[in-house]
Amino acid sequence: MSRSIKKGPFADAHLLKKVDEQQAAEKKQVIKTWSRRSTIFPSFVGLTIAVYDGRKHVPVFVTEDMVGHKLGEFVPTRTFRGHKADDKASK
């Protein structure tokens, strides 16, 4: 279920503050965040945001196609290591 239209999109205030500071600065740096739940706004386009996946911060370069999605959608939290090998196949 999607978010109510009357509520509008959500983004953490501390992330918005960091984005505004970054756009005012001449030199672009990576913005570190733990806020996977924040919606990507058009003002984020062109910035690199390092999103926490539970182990490390993974850098995500924001493009126009990402606007409206959540930051956490672009950083998987689980590592798939493969299924167990079949013992019958080895014999």
UniProtKB/Swiss-Prot annotation:
Coiled coil: none annotated. GO terms for biological process: ribosomal small subunit assembly; translation. InterPro entries: Ribosomal_uS19 (IPR002222), Ribosomal_uS19_bac-type (IPR005732), Ribosomal_uS19_CS (IPR020934), Ribosomal_uS19_SF (IPR023575). Gene3D superfamilies: 30s Ribosomal Protein S19, Chain A (3.30.860.10). It comes from the Bacteria. Pfam families: Ribosomal_S19. Keywords: Ribonucleoprotein, Ribosomal protein, RNA-binding, rRNA-binding. One of its GO terms (molecular function) is structural constituent of ribosome. One of its GO terms (cellular component) is cytoplasm. SUPFAM superfamilies: Ribosomal protein S19. Belongs to the universal ribosomal protein uS19 family. PANTHER family: RIBOSOMAL PROTEIN S19P FAMILY MEMBER, SMALL RIBOSOMAL SUBUNIT PROTEIN US19M. Protein S19 forms a complex with S13 that binds strongly to the 16S ribosomal RNA. This is Small ribosomal subunit protein uS19.
